């Protein structure tokens, strides 16, 4: 690859980094807004989260197109291949993060506040939302900085997220058993619990791809 072509390729890789980081920040903002809407019952804020999801979907398609163009335009060397492969994998997780924020916002639109408080898990869901939000934000920061330490911290915190999911699920199941007439609201809260657990999983996925980007190793397998 000639010097001028290499410079152009590096500029395109840098632009890819910028696009992916911007999409990640937008997804993190969607989680934050969705959880604020849940706490406050702000239906306008919830609707804005839902409306912005299409923008993140568009960003996903643009990034995927750019990755494929980079693959086709040049024969990437190992480091470039890792960067483009990481972007292709991460963009899917980021898009799903935004989808789950939108799903939480959708539930908020029809969730009855008094009924939700009666189930008794809202404070735990708020706390779990904080954990999931920080995991996502830190995973994106780990990517931007190519920071293995931050990536490892995200992966380690997944145990806390999973433990909260399990405990909240059991509390909701016990409530439904005792109050079958209130099952609909309780099931809505269970779905929020599940979406938050998935947010943690997607943050871990991103962190693992950061490790791959830096080391060429993903999980237990050397790839590139």
What is each PLM-predicted segment?
Residues 1-224:
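Cytosolic, long alpha-helical scaffolding segments
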